[in-house]
Amino acid sequence: MINIWDNGGGRKIFVQPRMKKELACLVIHGIGRQKPDFADGLVARVSAQLHTLGHDPEVVAWQSVYWDDILRPAQDAYLKAAYQGADLNARAVRTLLLHALGDAAGYRQLPSGRRRGGEETMSYRRIHERVRDAVRSLYREPLASRPVPFVVVAHSFGGHILSNYIWDCQRRPDKRSSSFERMNWLSGFITFGCNIPLFTFACTEVVPIRFPHPGCRRTLSAMHAG
């Protein structure tokens, strides 16, 4: 924040130190076409609401995870070939369904010739690398490597991605990363239109992620029935 003070004989500019962050918030989008700035509206509205309630929105450090560009090229290439090769009707519906279902299929589908099992696909690894880079950026830049309570906000399929990412961090933690980057400061998991239950039907035993971390002093669980 910059304050300008005029003493009558000239203008002096004072740069105030940045306010320390008290909460970190990671936002990830769901299925369908998205833009890199998908989270801007959410951040602006939440910040405005915090201000209305008498809280300084500057104490929240925000970071978004954009991954649509990883899966989009293959889907767009297929649609282009399909539309050029046949006079297909209902193109808007076809495109919508392919983008929605294609994200889920491309995230975990094994490449041809690979054995079925616990192996991750290249897309799975690339998307998780995008999450890892976002968490690292959040920790090292706005937080200045100072851990604070960590909340994730996920829409639709983004909740499934983050759940898998947290699971991997808990089962195969990277000892070179900080406790914050290993998701040990996770204090809240907020989802919108979460479809995680759909991905449990193939499991003989559903084992959830450990949440909250034993180091968290308090947790609040809430579900909206609407």
Residue ranges and their predicted role:
Residues 32-36, 45-48, 56-146:
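Active-site catalytic motif of lipid deacylating hydrolases and related acyltransferases
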Residues 52-55, 90-95, 180, 216-221:
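Short, surface-exposed, polar/charged, turn-prone segments marking secondary-structure boundaries
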